[in-house]
Amino acid sequence: MRIGIDARELTGRPTGVGRYLASILAAWGDMPDAKAHTYLLYHPQEDQLDLPSPDSGALAIARRPVGGGRRSWWEQVRLPIALRRDRPEVLFAPAYSAPLMAGMPVVLTIHDLSFVAHPEWFGWRERTRRRWLTALSARAAGCVLTVSQFSKSEIVRLLAVPPDLVRVIPQAAVPSRIPGGGPPAAPGGITTRRREPFVLYVGSIFNRRRLRDLIRAFAIVARTRPELTLEIVGDDRSHPHEDLPAIAAAAGVGDRVNIRAYVPDETLYDLYSRAAVFAFLSQYEGFGLTPLEALAHGVPPIVLDTDVAREVYGDAASYVPMGDLDRTADALSRLLFDEAARRAILDKAPAVLGRYSWQKTARATLAAIEETARHPAGGPRG
């Protein structure tokens, strides 16, 4: 079978959805069933496609650069022309929307619905485009994949998609053999290395992730701990814009908060392996992958107490209430300096991490694609 894939997220600097798709392709490279198919990877002609690892070379992959722009015009006009030319049996769209005139069954992944649940976090053009295209794409798809039960409930509630059309396939903690895939793990999956006195955040910078609260809570702890620093890695996509350097300066820690928009995987995994604590104060996520990645590297995470966080991290996280700087500072201090508190979380990590693997994710995703191709009227159920 020939499987078309919208591979735009593998161009440029892959983050988020790009790492999701890269990890699935890498895992498919180890699966005999996956090697029976041919994969047509579509991307804008102007952008270089970056395949994730040598493992994906075990797959029959055909690159399909498509000219004629980017974003919605490319997706809705140029991509359908290429699909009609190549005629794959099914299209996998891993990033929220798909061509409405694809001319074939579509498997669509919707990771979260923040732009519907909280439109105030997006500019009017971006939220309108996302909401319209995602809703129409979901209703036209043969199968909708998502990453948590929480996100499934949001898709059903906010987009009016029938629940039996939506399948939950979680992500996993560490990308499958992406170059620089991290230091060796100790038994149980937790990496061992001497920790350094810094707090780490990794992820795109959105308002919902409340970096302003993290900086201010960090400042409370840092007043009496001059050795502490806060490392923030993520592209600033806040709306309305939040000036994090100014917030840090106002809190008195401007010289102790280091912000980088992007780091290569080798640097990222080095940061994970050295950090003492990971903090991710997001009030809305579909899954929330980076705290799991931190946990896999032996870093206890602090997260907001939300339904999806409880679903994903279970007992292997420290939970704090939204907006409570004192409680957040207490959690930071406890996990930075109390070894028993750190161990209480890390001892729970193997059971939580054992729920997830990119092999499981890739296998379930391929099954959904194959079944949707065979039964295009509705795809898989469950």
Where are these regions (language model features)?
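Carbohydrate transferase catalytic cores enriched for Leloir-type hexosyltransferases
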Residues: 1-382
